[in-house]
């Protein structure tokens, strides 16, 4: 039930096991939060636009016994993002470490070292929150209590912006390294610092785009 990415992934895995699958969707086309709409010849993503963990799509294709590139073309973005500020300055958010640090130095050389600290912290959060807890069941209160100490150690009660600000001083750079929650509909000022792990995801696997937009990716999975 539901044809978002979760429903599509479940359907693909179930079908690969030999079961006949019927996917139910309340809207006029698949996608869920990845819904797209058209207007005057243009197509707009209503939800996610980029791919930060392409390996999960490759895994689904492998399970289905097909090649992902036969259904959708996914290309890397370089830079990941180009960020424009009101004062006319531009920040190219890149995957290459040296180029990224050079961009940081243009805004505040002293923040290069602070960024490295944030980068290490992002990996620490990823290792615990994504690698160890991503498949943890939270359907019972007792299960949540078990991981409470881990969440406290990760300072999950802090916002992403506050966490970034503990490492980086320049106001513009604080925005650069804390805006990712916006991609999932969150507010960096109150979204849990757990989401700072997105930075490590991007640095490790890159930022990618499905040619034709998210709708093309959804149709490829269908």
Question: Where would I find each of the regions flagged by the language model?
Answer:
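Rossmann-like flavin
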Residues: 86-191
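Helical element adjacent to the flavin cofactor pocket in flavoenzyme catalytic cores
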Residues: 155, 197-222
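Active-site-proximal loop/short-helix segments
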Residues: 190-198
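Alpha-helical scaffold segments in soluble metabolic enzymes
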Residues: 56-59, 63, 103, 162-166, ...
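Alpha-helix capping and helix-loop boundary segments enriched in small/acidic/polar residues
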Residues: 48, 189, 208-212
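A short glycine/serine-rich beta->alpha loop
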Residues: 39-43, 182-185, 205-208
